[in-house]
């Protein structure tokens, strides 16, 4: 199983004081060295954390691959074609939200998503859609030509009871298997921590987890190398469990 380390909140800390540190590039390189299989960055329309220059700098520095999260807008499409990341994950975006609140509604935007997916694919960029684990959305993702889906794990991570967490986990598990049966590559992420990652990492249909906020939070106490190492180890151990 692959670990994508999202470095958005390195930029959040930097921007809080308007300094040049901590460096997203340095964070990306440290994460790579200690187990990250790819680096994920979300260039939001309001540029609240990652800036355009960060994306270019990280793309040019890393040895693994860049997964660029972006909204379904012409501006972001143009940026992606300039940066040429290995992967683009199209996500829903609202300016007033603190973080991404739900999955992309592919059913409501099939024509536009299909257009973007074709342009990116023709440019050699692999397209992923960040969606809820809903069979209709998963089928729509396949129909618009996206080869990859990233299942939104936020409801699982935020569940307020054990029963609700189990319900949300089963939804993710079933969605992952359904997507896999359709021939889609399945990733997952949002809200995952060292404490809740094990069940999700046990789902064999899921190839990759993208994790950011909790890793950066752990890094405040452990250091980024150890935070990445521990997460990677937790994912590895999960795959060994029966």
Curated annotation (Swiss-Prot):
<feature type="binding site">
    <location>
        <position position="6"/>
    </location>
    <ligand>
        <name>3-amino-2-oxopropyl phosphate</name>
    </ligand>
</feature>
<feature type="binding site">
    <location>
        <begin position="8"/>
        <end position="9"/>
    </location>
    <ligand>
        <name>1-deoxy-D-xylulose 5-phosphate</name>
    </ligand>
</feature>
<feature type="active site" description="Proton acceptor">
    <location>
        <position position="42"/>
    </location>
</feature>
<keyword id="KW-0963">Cytoplasm</keyword>
<feature type="binding site">
    <location>
        <position position="99"/>
    </location>
    <ligand>
        <name>1-deoxy-D-xylulose 5-phosphate</name>
    </ligand>
</feature>
<feature type="active site" description="Proton acceptor">
    <location>
        <position position="69"/>
    </location>
</feature>
<dbReference type="InterPro" id="IPR036130">
    <property type="entry name" value="Pyridoxine-5'_phos_synth"/>
</dbReference>
<dbReference type="GO" id="GO:0008615">
    <property type="term" value="P:pyridoxine biosynthetic process"/>
</dbReference>
<comment type="function">
    <text>Catalyzes the complicated ring closure reaction between the two acyclic compounds 1-deoxy-D-xylulose-5-phosphate (DXP) and 3-amino-2-oxopropyl phosphate (1-amino-acetone-3-phosphate or AAP) to form pyridoxine 5'-phosphate (PNP) and inorganic phosphate.</text>
</comment>
<feature type="active site" description="Proton donor">
    <location>
        <position position="190"/>
    </location>
</feature>
<feature type="binding site">
    <location>
        <position position="44"/>
    </location>
    <ligand>
        <name>1-deoxy-D-xylulose 5-phosphate</name>
    </ligand>
</feature>
<keyword id="KW-0664">Pyridoxine biosynthesis</keyword>
<feature type="binding site">
    <location>
        <begin position="212"/>
        <end position="213"/>
    </location>
    <ligand>
        <name>3-amino-2-oxopropyl phosphate</name>
    </ligand>
</feature>
<feature type="site" description="Transition state stabilizer">
    <location>
        <position position="150"/>
    </location>
</feature>
<comment type="similarity">
    <text>Belongs to the PNP synthase family.</text>
</comment>
<dbReference type="InterPro" id="IPR004569">
    <property type="entry name" value="PyrdxlP_synth_PdxJ"/>
</dbReference>
<feature type="binding site">
    <location>
        <position position="49"/>
    </location>
    <ligand>
        <name>1-deoxy-D-xylulose 5-phosphate</name>
    </ligand>
</feature>
<dbReference type="GO" id="GO:0033856">
    <property type="term" value="F:pyridoxine 5'-phosphate synthase activity"/>
</dbReference>
<comment type="pathway">
    <text>Cofactor biosynthesis; pyridoxine 5'-phosphate biosynthesis; pyridoxine 5'-phosphate from D-erythrose 4-phosphate: step 5/5.</text>
</comment>
<feature type="binding site">
    <location>
        <position position="191"/>
    </location>
    <ligand>
        <name>3-amino-2-oxopropyl phosphate</name>
    </ligand>
</feature>
<dbReference type="InterPro" id="IPR013785">
    <property type="entry name" value="Aldolase_TIM"/>
</dbReference>
<comment type="subunit">
    <text>Homooctamer; tetramer of dimers.</text>
</comment>
<feature type="binding site">
    <location>
        <position position="17"/>
    </location>
    <ligand>
        <name>3-amino-2-oxopropyl phosphate</name>
    </ligand>
</feature>
<protein>
    <recommendedName>
        <fullName>Pyridoxine 5'-phosphate synthase</fullName>
        <ecNumber>2.6.99.2</ecNumber>
    </recommendedName>
</protein>
<dbReference type="Pfam" id="PF03740">
    <property type="entry name" value="PdxJ"/>
</dbReference>
<keyword id="KW-0808">Transferase</keyword>
<dbReference type="GO" id="GO:0005829">
    <property type="term" value="C:cytosol"/>
</dbReference>
């Amino acid at each position: 199983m692959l670990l994508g380390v999202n470095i958005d909140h390195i930029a959040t800390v930097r921007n809080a004081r308007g300094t040049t540190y901590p460096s997203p590039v340095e964070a990306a390189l440290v994460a790579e060295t200690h187990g990250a299989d790819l680096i994920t960055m979300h260039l939001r329309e309001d540029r609240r954390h990652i800036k355009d220059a960060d994306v270019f700098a990280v793309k040019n520095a890393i040895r693994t691959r860049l997964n660029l999260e972006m909204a379904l807008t012409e501006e972001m499409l143009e940026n992606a074609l300039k940066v040429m990341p290995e992967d683009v994950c199209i996500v829903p975006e609202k300016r007033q939200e603190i973080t991404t609140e739900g999955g992309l509604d592919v059913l409501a935007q099939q024509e536009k998503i299909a257009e973007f997916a074709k342009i990116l694919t023709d440019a050699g960029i692999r397209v992923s859609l960040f969606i809820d684990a809903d069979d209709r959305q998963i089928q729509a993702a396949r129909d618009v030509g996206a080869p990859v889906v990233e299942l939104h794990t936020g409801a699982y991570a935020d569940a307020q009871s054990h029963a609700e967490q189990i319900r949300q986990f089963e939804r993710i598990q079933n969605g992952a298997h359904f997507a896999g049966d359709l021939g889609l590559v399945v990733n997952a992420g949002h809200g995952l921590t060292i404490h809740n990652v094990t069940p999700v990492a046990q789902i064999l249909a899921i190839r990759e987890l993208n994790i950011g906020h909790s890793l950066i939070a752990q890094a405040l106490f452990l250091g980024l190398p150890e935070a990445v190492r521990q997460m990677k180890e937790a994912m590895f151990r999960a795959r060994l469990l029966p």
